[in-house]
Amino acid sequence: MPSSSSSNSRPGVPPDVIAALEDALGRDRIERNEASCVFFSTDLSRSGVAAAAIARPGTTDEVGAILRICAQAQVSVVPRGGGFSYTGGYLPINESTIIVDLRDLNHVIEINTEDMYVVVEAGCTWERLYEALKSENVRTPYFGPMSGFGATVGGALSQGSFFLGSSQYGPVADSVLAVEIVLADGTTMRTGSWGGVDNASPFYRSYGPDMTGLFLGDTGALGFKTKAVLKLVPFPRHTQFLSFVFDREEAAVAAVSAVGRLGIAGECYCWDPYFVKVMAAQSTSLMQDLKLLAGVARGQKGSRGLFNAARLAIAGKSVFDGEVFMLNISIDDPTAEGANARQALLRDVLAGTDAREITPSAPMATRGTPFINFNTSERRTTMRNLPTNGLVPHSRLAALSRDIRLVLANRADDMARHGIECGVIYFGVGQQGACLEPLIYWDDPRHFQHDRVAEVSNIDALAGFDGPSETTEIAMQIRKELTAVMVRHGSAHVQIGKTYPWLATRTPPIAALIGAIKRHVDPDGRMNPGSLGLADLPV
């Protein structure tokens, strides 16, 4: 980490505010280096206005001190976790902004296997939480995104998230019992049964109005999460896997919904032919392959893990051959008989389709190594990817899929001319709906100058670029067109950030209510301004 320097001149925040923050946290906890401030003001989609400073608290009290100081000085504050936003979630919109890096609040505070909950700080990564719980033979129902090596609990709760465990248990919000929140004036509060005045326990969410839900998916616009209480389930004793391929997208989409409605699969996700080809062409070294097989063996106990690792090794990458859609399923159960019964039921459900069963290499590998460190030097390339997600009820998934394909077909010439590629993944999310997620890929040397390994931006190199390239602008326009189609189909979204039109698509009574709440908890509109569309509200 670059050294802190209060003498390093940065615009936007008066020196006495910086001095007060340094007094509250220590000088080494306030970063003003330009390369760091620009980096922390850039997410996976774009750059915001560079923050005046980065503050790194280590406790809830220190978060409260930051927010109090900034509120008194009319300075904006933006929370940041692992930095995996791709919708402008933590990007400042004005120079008078302090970014609050919450990753030092990273402790697993209590694992209560009697009452089946865990108390964890918001800056803890999903991988760290998973490993701590696994040692106690428990797990959270939803247990993280694939980016959970660096993505934090607080980031997922603020922006919304689904993947591991989500086909059976729903998105992350459905696994939350309570949260600890710091409001704009520095006040700390707790929700659910944890918010009682005497002998409070966080075991129950639904005591009175659901105050926990109010602060989930809020993008940090209503409060900064410092702790969360999540449900626990016994760590699955038995896991089975299935993979199928389809020639037709309509059949694959219908299969995602058929599996999702049953609610018996931990994960259910389908890759289109683009992603199947990516997996087939993936160039890995022998050492990386051995690590993957070791992960599969380690991820399941005893002979079952060794057997599945051997199956994966024998199948190799041949399972990724062909112009096909690939459906991948993980199945958890307390007993081998139960896991086998679930597996048999899913085979029966898909028997009447054009599904062809193949070796389940992909879901085995995912569960064997569930969290990937994306921020490594060997993964640093100029190739970017930008997801766009839309969650719809099962009854609307096929129509949304067709309209998304029309957008991509209409843009095919532009994409070919500029080297832009796009693949689509489908996810089952709970029993009521599914997600369609196109990912756009293109080459962007400018964005490469934001180094996610060193966590600094190359200021000199960035100065040599005259704004975003034409290719980047076209990619962003395609994303807007995809989003517009999703909105037309009534989609919900995770990672709302400053991209999806949440407020603009709410009915007037909801917009008025959220405006009143925002003005109560953040009367000056200084908490992550612009997120949720709340910058459009009068304060």
Predicted regions and their residues:
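Conserved glycine-rich FAD pyrophosphate-binding loop
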Residues: 2-11, 44-50, 75, 80-82, ...
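Conserved oxyanion/phosphate-binding beta-strand-loop segments in alpha/beta enzyme cores
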Residues: 20-41
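Flexible, glycine/charged-enriched surface loops at secondary-structure junctions
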Residues: 28-34, 141-144, 253-284, 293, ...
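Long, structured ligand/cofactor-binding scaffold of large enzymes
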Residues: 40-139, 151-162
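Short, conserved charged micro-motifs
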Residues: 62-65, 128, 249-254, 334-345, ...
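FAD-binding subdomain of flavoenzyme oxidoreductases
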Residues: 109-111, 122, 127-264, 268, ...
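Charged, glycine/proline-rich intrinsically disordered loops and linkers
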Residues: 191-205, 279-319, 445-473
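A conserved active-site cap/scaffold subdomain adjacent to cofactor or substrate pockets
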Residues: 245-248, 317-356
